[in-house]
């Protein structure tokens, strides 16, 4: 095993969460190493950005680079219910984009390098502990094992949930939305709406947990996803191709119409049990950000936005912890902030799936419309005193009580 280096912060994973955490830590004068197992660019879903994510990108000074990369503007989200009924439109209040994640994530990685984040391609194998505190990691690179020491180890490994698998963070627990499988692929030649709505996200649903996304990720390429319950997938489908075909036939005729002359690019893929949470996700010398501790139903595209926001907020907690030699107060504050925002988003999504028609009505309610639009734009962590989250929570609690009685 080689000699080890020491850093203030070691980050596992260089997706949006890891890159933003690294950038913000470097701005605060901390030394940062990011260890990434995959060679970039690499494929990833999560291609539609909220308005909140768009603002973070502008704050990074990347707006011109986003436009130069050909990422389409995202005017809004069109939600279409069964048989094209129950349709409503969600405008985007802050400019943002649809993205090809391989290029977008690579852009964030380059920005992190510009800020002085050091990178190492390698596979993290284990953590190093001393007197119960996490003090580093062991990783494999170039067929050798290496040690690196850290004041804080950050798990930004996404759905690999590294620290959970190693027994450092809590166990991965299923969420309400977990019993689904998403199948997805990219296509050229998809029929789009007329400008200025041609680059909207389109969500089509037939009934609870049966839905599809269509996301324009470049001037000539669209992402199609079909999401169905796991038991239906295993009953009707042998592979992701079958699931996509099933969705075209059964979720909405609009999918077939738009894709009748389209050509698929590359293979289709699938992902199961994608909704989970992990508790605890902070501890002595470590914390988790983004998908490494929680992932919700992706219907409203919160994933990248929440990952970036948590990366930024975690950097604040890390700086406070190191400066004050306090490994509890700042990390617990980050935990509580994260849980609060994530729960508001989870309530909103559950409310939509339980009361989809009434959710559309709430979009037209003058007392709630602005709040709902802002929540859908990613402002779930900054909504103290708003009416909408309380309405959603009360309705869900009443629904759950009736389910227990009935």
From Swiss-Prot:
Molecular function terms, GO-annotated: FAD binding; oxidoreductase activity
Gene3D superfamilies assigned: FAD/NAD(P)-binding domain (3.50.50.60)
Broad class of enzyme this protein falls into: oxidoreductase
Effect of a null allele: Deletion of the gene abolishes the production of several bromopyrroles.
SUPFAM superfamilies cross-referenced by the UniProt entry: FAD/NAD(P)-binding domain
Source superkingdom: Bacteria
Binding site for FAD: 17, 36, 42, 44-45, 48, 101, 124, 291, 304
Catalytic activity: (1H-pyrrole-2-carbonyl)-[peptidyl-carrier protein] + 3 bromide + 3 FADH2 + 3 O2 = (3,4,5-tribromo-1H-pyrrole-2-carbonyl)-[peptidyl-carrier protein] + 3 FAD + 6 H2O; (1H-pyrrole-2-carbonyl)-[peptidyl-carrier protein] + bromide + FADH2 + O2 = (5-bromo-1H-pyrrole-2-carbonyl)-[peptidyl-carrier protein] + FAD + 2 H2O; (5-bromo-1H-pyrrole-2-carbonyl)-[peptidyl-carrier protein] + bromide + FADH2 + O2 = (4,5-dibromo-1H-pyrrole-2-carbonyl)-[peptidyl-carrier protein] + FAD + 2 H2O; (4,5-dibromo-1H-pyrrole-2-carbonyl)-[peptidyl-carrier protein] + bromide + FADH2 + O2 = (3,4,5-tribromo-1H-pyrrole-2-carbonyl)-[peptidyl-carrier protein] + FAD + 2 H2O
EC number of this enzyme: 1.14.19.57
UniProt keyword list: FAD, Flavoprotein, Oxidoreductase
Function: Brominase involved in the biosynthesis of polybrominated aromatic organic compounds. Catalyzes three successive rounds of bromination of pyrrolyl-S-Bmp1 to produce mono-, di- and tribromopyrrolyl-S-Bmp1.
Family per record: Belongs to the flavin-dependent halogenase family.
Protein's recorded name: 1H-pyrrole-2-carbonyl-[peptidyl-carrier protein] brominase
């Amino acid at each position: 095993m080689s000699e080890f280096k020491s850093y203030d912060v070691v980050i596992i994973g260089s997706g949006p969460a890891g890159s933003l955490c690294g950038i913000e830590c470097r701005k605060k004068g901390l030394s940062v190493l990011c260890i990434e197992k995959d060679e970039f660019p690499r494929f990833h879903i999560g291609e539609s950005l909220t308005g909140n994510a768009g603002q973070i990108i502008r704050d990074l000074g990347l707006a011109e680079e986003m436009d130069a990369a050909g990422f389409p503007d995202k005017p809004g989200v069109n939600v279409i219910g069964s048989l094209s009924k129950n349709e409503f439109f969600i405008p985007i209040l802050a400019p943002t984009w649809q993205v090809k994640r391989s290029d977008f994530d690579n852009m964030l990685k380059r920005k992190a390098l510009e800020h002085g984040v050091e990178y190492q391609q390698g596979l993290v194998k284990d953590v190093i502990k001393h007197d119960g505190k996490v003090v580093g990691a062991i990783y494999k690179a170039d067929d050798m094992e290496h040690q690196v020491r850290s004041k804080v180890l950050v798990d930004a490994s996404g759905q690999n949930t590294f620290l959970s698998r190693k027994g450092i963070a809590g166990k991965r627990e299923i969420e309400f939305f977990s019993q689904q499988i998403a199948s997805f692929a990219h296509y050229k030649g998809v029929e789009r709406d007329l400008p200025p709505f041609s680059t909207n996200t389109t969500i089509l649903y037939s009934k609870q947990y049966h839905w599809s996304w269509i996301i324009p990720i470049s001037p000539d390429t669209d992402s199609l996803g079909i999401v169905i319950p796991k038991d239906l997938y295993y009953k009707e489908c042998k592979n992701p191709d079958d699931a996509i075909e099933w969705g075209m036939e059964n979720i909405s005729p609009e999918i077939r119409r738009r894709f009748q002359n389209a050509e698929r690019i590359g293979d289709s893929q699938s992902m199961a049990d994608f909704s989970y949470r992990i508790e605890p996700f902070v501890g002595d010398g470590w914390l988790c950000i983004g998908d490494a501790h929680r992932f919700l139903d992706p219907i409203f595209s919160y994933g990248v936005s929440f990952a970036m926001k948590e990366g930024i907020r975690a950097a604040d907690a890390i700086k406070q912890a190191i400066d004050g030699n306090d490994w509890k107060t700042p990390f617990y504050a980050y935990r509580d902030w994260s849980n609060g925002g994530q729960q508001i988003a989870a309530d909103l999504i559950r409310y939509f799936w339980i009361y989809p028609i009434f959710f559309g009505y709430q979009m037209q309610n003058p007392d709630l419309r602005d709040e709902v639009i802002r929540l859908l734009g990613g402002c779930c962590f900054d909504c103290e005193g708003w009416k909408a989250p309380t309405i959603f929570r009360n309705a869900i609690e009443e629904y759950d009580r009736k389910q227990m009685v009935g």
